[in-house]
Protein backbone atom coordinates (compact mmCIF):
# COMPACT_ATOMS: atom_id res chain seq x y z
CA UNK A 1 0.00 0.00 0.00
CA UNK A 2 1.43 3.38 -1.04
CA UNK A 3 1.17 6.40 1.25
CA UNK A 4 0.84 10.11 0.50
CA UNK A 5 3.22 12.49 2.25
CA UNK A 6 1.17 15.46 1.02
CA UNK A 7 -2.00 14.12 2.62
CA UNK A 8 -0.15 13.20 5.81
CA UNK A 9 1.26 16.66 6.47
CA UNK A 10 -2.14 18.39 6.23
CA UNK A 11 -2.36 17.86 10.00
CA UNK A 12 1.36 17.88 10.73
CA UNK A 13 1.19 19.77 14.04
CA UNK A 14 -1.37 17.35 15.45
CA UNK A 15 0.51 14.30 14.16
CA UNK A 16 3.86 15.55 15.47
CA UNK A 17 2.69 16.25 19.01
CA UNK A 18 2.68 12.55 20.05
CA UNK A 19 6.22 12.19 18.68
CA UNK A 20 7.26 15.19 20.75
CA UNK A 21 5.58 13.72 23.84
CA UNK A 22 7.29 10.37 23.25
CA UNK A 23 10.74 11.91 22.79
CA UNK A 24 10.31 13.91 26.01
CA UNK A 25 10.29 10.62 27.94
CA UNK A 26 13.45 9.20 26.35
CA UNK A 27 16.02 9.27 29.19
CA UNK A 28 19.12 9.72 27.02
CA UNK A 29 21.16 12.91 27.37
CA UNK A 30 23.32 12.11 24.35
CA UNK A 31 23.44 9.60 21.50
CA UNK A 32 25.99 8.26 19.07
CA UNK A 33 23.35 6.79 16.80
CA UNK A 34 19.56 7.09 16.64
CA UNK A 35 17.21 5.73 13.97
CA UNK A 36 13.68 6.94 13.30
CA UNK A 37 11.73 3.85 12.24
CA UNK A 38 8.87 4.56 9.86
CA UNK A 39 10.10 8.13 9.60
CA UNK A 40 7.38 9.23 7.16
CA UNK A 41 8.01 12.75 5.79
CA UNK A 42 10.67 13.42 8.43
CA UNK A 43 8.64 15.38 10.98
CA UNK A 44 9.62 13.04 13.83
CA UNK A 45 13.23 12.75 12.60
CA UNK A 46 13.43 16.52 12.81
CA UNK A 47 12.60 16.38 16.52
CA UNK A 48 15.38 13.88 17.19
CA UNK A 49 17.89 16.07 15.34
CA UNK A 50 16.73 19.14 17.27
CA UNK A 51 17.41 17.35 20.55
CA UNK A 52 20.58 15.41 19.80
CA UNK A 53 22.13 17.06 16.74
CA UNK A 54 22.26 15.82 13.17
CA UNK A 55 25.30 13.54 13.57
CA UNK A 56 24.29 9.91 13.99
CA UNK A 57 20.57 10.41 13.29
CA UNK A 58 18.95 8.64 10.34
CA UNK A 59 15.47 7.70 9.17
CA UNK A 60 14.01 4.53 7.73
CA UNK A 61 10.78 3.92 5.82
CA UNK A 62 9.37 1.47 3.29
CA UNK A 63 7.49 4.06 1.22
CA UNK A 64 9.21 5.93 -1.62
CA UNK A 65 6.87 8.93 -1.44
CA UNK A 66 7.54 9.42 2.27
CA UNK A 67 11.30 9.03 1.80
CA UNK A 68 11.32 11.58 -1.01
CA UNK A 69 9.53 14.09 1.23
CA UNK A 70 11.88 13.39 4.15
CA UNK A 71 14.99 13.85 2.00
CA UNK A 72 13.67 17.14 0.63
CA UNK A 73 12.89 18.31 4.14
CA UNK A 74 16.22 17.27 5.71
CA UNK A 75 18.88 17.03 2.97
CA UNK A 76 21.67 16.60 5.52
CA UNK A 77 20.13 13.48 7.06
CA UNK A 78 20.38 9.93 5.76
CA UNK A 79 17.06 8.27 4.91
CA UNK A 80 17.00 4.60 3.92
CA UNK A 81 14.35 2.33 2.41
CA UNK A 82 13.83 -0.84 4.43
CA UNK A 83 11.17 -3.27 5.63
CA UNK A 84 10.58 -3.02 9.38
CA UNK A 85 9.23 -6.57 9.45
CA UNK A 86 12.76 -7.92 8.96
CA UNK A 87 15.14 -4.99 9.58
CA UNK A 88 17.82 -4.80 12.27
CA UNK A 89 20.61 -2.21 12.64
CA UNK A 90 24.02 -3.34 11.46
CA UNK A 91 25.40 -2.62 14.93
CA UNK A 92 23.82 -1.75 18.31
CA UNK A 93 22.47 1.80 18.54
CA UNK A 94 21.38 4.15 21.32
CA UNK A 95 17.82 4.92 20.24
CA UNK A 96 15.22 3.22 18.08
CA UNK A 97 12.27 5.59 17.78
CA UNK A 98 8.95 4.87 16.07
CA UNK A 99 5.97 7.22 15.87
CA UNK A 100 2.72 5.69 14.58
CA UNK A 101 4.01 2.89 12.37
CA UNK A 102 3.98 -0.46 14.17
CA UNK A 103 0.19 -0.61 14.52
CA UNK A 104 0.24 -1.69 10.85
CA UNK A 105 2.38 -4.77 11.55
CA UNK A 106 0.38 -7.60 13.18
CA UNK A 107 3.53 -9.28 14.56
CA UNK A 108 5.00 -6.14 16.10
CA UNK A 109 5.48 -7.82 19.48
CA UNK A 110 8.01 -10.15 17.88
CA UNK A 111 9.59 -7.20 16.10
CA UNK A 112 9.95 -5.23 19.35
CA UNK A 113 11.63 -8.23 20.97
CA UNK A 114 14.09 -8.40 18.07
CA UNK A 115 14.71 -4.65 18.06
CA UNK A 116 15.78 -4.81 21.71
CA UNK A 117 18.71 -6.89 20.46
CA UNK A 118 19.69 -3.97 18.22
CA UNK A 119 20.23 -1.63 21.18
CA UNK A 120 23.31 -0.95 23.26
CA UNK A 121 23.07 -1.58 26.99
CA UNK A 122 21.16 1.44 28.28
CA UNK A 123 19.74 2.07 24.82
CA UNK A 124 16.08 2.93 24.36
CA UNK A 125 13.22 1.54 22.29
CA UNK A 126 10.60 4.31 22.09
CA UNK A 127 7.26 3.49 20.44
CA UNK A 128 3.95 5.31 19.91
CA UNK A 129 0.94 3.67 18.27
CA UNK A 130 -2.65 4.80 17.71
CA UNK A 131 -5.08 2.79 19.85
CA UNK A 132 -8.26 4.11 18.30
CA UNK A 133 -10.08 1.21 16.66
CA UNK A 134 -13.06 1.63 19.00
CA UNK A 135 -13.41 5.35 18.21
CA UNK A 136 -16.26 6.44 15.90
CA UNK A 137 -13.72 7.51 13.28
CA UNK A 138 -12.75 3.86 12.81
CA UNK A 139 -16.03 2.15 13.67
CA UNK A 140 -17.64 4.12 10.85
CA UNK A 141 -15.05 2.78 8.41
CA UNK A 142 -16.29 -0.73 9.17
CA UNK A 143 -19.93 0.36 8.96
CA UNK A 144 -19.35 1.97 5.58
CA UNK A 145 -17.49 -1.09 4.32
CA UNK A 146 -20.44 -3.35 5.17
CA UNK A 147 -23.05 -1.18 3.46
CA UNK A 148 -22.85 -0.33 -0.21
CA UNK A 149 -21.98 -1.79 -3.60
CA UNK A 150 -18.45 -2.44 -2.33
CA UNK A 151 -19.57 -4.68 0.56
CA UNK A 152 -18.79 -7.95 -1.24
CA UNK A 153 -15.12 -7.00 -1.51
CA UNK A 154 -14.92 -6.42 2.24
CA UNK A 155 -16.87 -9.60 3.04
CA UNK A 156 -14.17 -11.56 1.23
CA UNK A 157 -11.26 -9.73 2.86
CA UNK A 158 -11.08 -7.46 5.89
CA UNK A 159 -8.67 -4.52 5.81
CA UNK A 160 -9.19 -3.64 9.48
CA UNK A 161 -5.88 -3.64 11.31
CA UNK A 162 -5.49 -5.78 14.42
CA UNK A 163 -6.31 -4.19 17.79
CA UNK A 164 -3.34 -3.53 20.06
CA UNK A 165 -2.69 -5.99 22.90
CA UNK A 166 -3.10 -4.85 26.51
CA UNK A 167 -0.13 -2.91 27.95
CA UNK A 168 0.68 -5.88 30.20
CA UNK A 169 1.39 -7.99 27.10
CA UNK A 170 4.09 -5.57 25.97
CA UNK A 171 5.54 -5.41 29.47
CA UNK A 172 5.73 -9.18 29.87
CA UNK A 173 7.26 -9.63 26.42
CA UNK A 174 10.05 -7.05 26.89
CA UNK A 175 10.86 -7.03 30.59
CA UNK A 176 13.38 -9.86 30.27
CA UNK A 177 15.60 -7.59 28.16
CA UNK A 178 14.72 -4.31 29.87
CA UNK A 179 16.05 -2.45 32.88
CA UNK A 180 12.90 -0.33 32.88
CA UNK A 181 9.67 -0.07 30.90
CA UNK A 182 7.30 2.90 30.86
CA UNK A 183 3.84 2.38 29.35
CA UNK A 184 1.03 4.92 29.16
CA UNK A 185 -1.95 6.06 27.16
CA UNK A 186 -2.73 9.63 26.16
CA UNK A 187 -6.12 10.70 24.80
CA UNK A 188 -5.73 13.67 22.48
CA UNK A 189 -8.77 15.77 21.64
CA UNK A 190 -8.14 17.61 18.39
CA UNK A 191 -10.43 20.52 17.55
CA UNK A 192 -10.93 20.29 13.78
CA UNK A 193 -12.89 22.58 11.50
CA UNK A 194 -15.70 20.14 10.73
CA UNK A 195 -16.53 16.51 10.00
CA UNK A 196 -14.93 16.81 6.56
CA UNK A 197 -11.64 17.61 8.28
CA UNK A 198 -11.82 14.30 10.14
CA UNK A 199 -12.22 12.55 6.80
CA UNK A 200 -9.22 14.43 5.42
CA UNK A 201 -7.20 13.38 8.48
CA UNK A 202 -7.94 9.67 8.18
CA UNK A 203 -7.58 9.61 4.38
CA UNK A 204 -3.82 9.73 4.97
CA UNK A 205 -3.81 6.72 7.28
CA UNK A 206 -6.68 4.62 8.62
CA UNK A 207 -9.16 5.20 5.79
CA UNK A 208 -6.63 4.63 3.03
CA UNK A 209 -6.78 0.79 3.02
CA UNK A 210 -10.59 0.97 2.82
CA UNK A 211 -10.55 3.34 -0.13
CA UNK A 212 -7.97 1.22 -1.93
CA UNK A 213 -9.93 -1.98 -1.31
CA UNK A 214 -13.26 -0.46 -2.37
CA UNK A 215 -11.71 0.28 -5.75
CA UNK A 216 -11.28 3.42 -7.81
CA UNK A 217 -14.83 3.17 -9.16
CA UNK A 218 -16.27 3.39 -5.62
CA UNK A 219 -13.77 5.77 -4.02
CA UNK A 220 -15.91 8.92 -4.16
CA UNK A 221 -19.13 7.17 -3.10
CA UNK A 222 -17.39 5.35 -0.25
CA UNK A 223 -15.92 8.65 0.96
CA UNK A 224 -19.31 10.39 0.80
CA UNK A 225 -21.01 7.57 2.71
CA UNK A 226 -18.29 7.64 5.35
CA UNK A 227 -18.53 11.43 5.67
CA UNK A 228 -22.29 11.22 6.27
CA UNK A 229 -21.69 8.78 9.12
CA UNK A 230 -18.92 10.93 10.58
CA UNK A 231 -21.20 13.98 10.54
CA UNK A 232 -23.67 12.09 12.74
CA UNK A 233 -20.98 10.66 15.04
CA UNK A 234 -19.22 13.99 15.65
CA UNK A 235 -21.79 16.74 16.31
CA UNK A 236 -20.48 20.30 15.99
CA UNK A 237 -19.39 22.30 19.03
CA UNK A 238 -20.72 25.77 19.79
CA UNK A 239 -18.25 27.33 17.34
CA UNK A 240 -18.97 24.77 14.62
CA UNK A 241 -15.80 22.75 15.10
CA UNK A 242 -15.67 19.06 16.05
CA UNK A 243 -13.51 17.19 18.55
CA UNK A 244 -11.60 14.19 17.25
CA UNK A 245 -10.70 12.02 20.23
CA UNK A 246 -7.50 10.11 19.51
CA UNK A 247 -6.13 7.58 22.04
CA UNK A 248 -2.49 6.58 21.66
CA UNK A 249 -0.29 4.01 23.41
CA UNK A 250 3.29 4.88 24.37
CA UNK A 251 6.13 2.52 25.27
CA UNK A 252 9.68 3.38 26.37
CA UNK A 253 11.92 0.40 27.16
CA UNK A 254 15.50 0.81 28.41
CA UNK A 255 17.73 -2.16 27.62
CA UNK A 256 19.61 -3.92 30.41
Swiss-Prot record:
Pfam families: Methyltransf_11. InterPro entries: Methyltransf_11, SAM-dependent_MTases_sf, Trans-aconitate_MeTrfase, Trans_acon_MeTrfase_C. Its EC number is 2.1.1.144. It comes from the Bacteria. It catalyses: trans-aconitate + S-adenosyl-L-methionine = (E)-3-(methoxycarbonyl)pent-2-enedioate + S-adenosyl-L-homocysteine. It is found in: Cytoplasm. Its main location: cytoplasm. SUPFAM superfamilies: S-adenosyl-L-methionine-dependent methyltransferases. One of its GO terms (molecular function) is trans-aconitate 2-methyltransferase activity. One of its GO terms (cellular component) is cytoplasm. Keywords: Cytoplasm, Methyltransferase, S-adenosyl-L-methionine, Transferase. One of its GO terms (biological process) is methylation. Belongs to the methyltransferase superfamily. Tam family. Catalyzes the S-adenosylmethionine monomethyl esterification of trans-aconitate. NCBIfam families: PRK01683.1. This is Trans-aconitate 2-methyltransferase. It comes from Rhizobium rhizogenes (strain K84 / ATCC BAA-868).
Amino acid sequence: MAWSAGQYVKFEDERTRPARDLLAQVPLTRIDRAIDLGCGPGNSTELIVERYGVAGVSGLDSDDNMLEAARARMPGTDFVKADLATWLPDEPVDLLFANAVFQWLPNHLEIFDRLMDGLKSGGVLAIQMPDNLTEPSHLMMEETAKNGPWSDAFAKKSVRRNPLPAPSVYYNRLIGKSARIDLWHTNYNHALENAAAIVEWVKATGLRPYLDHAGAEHRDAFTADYLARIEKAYPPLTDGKVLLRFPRLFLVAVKK
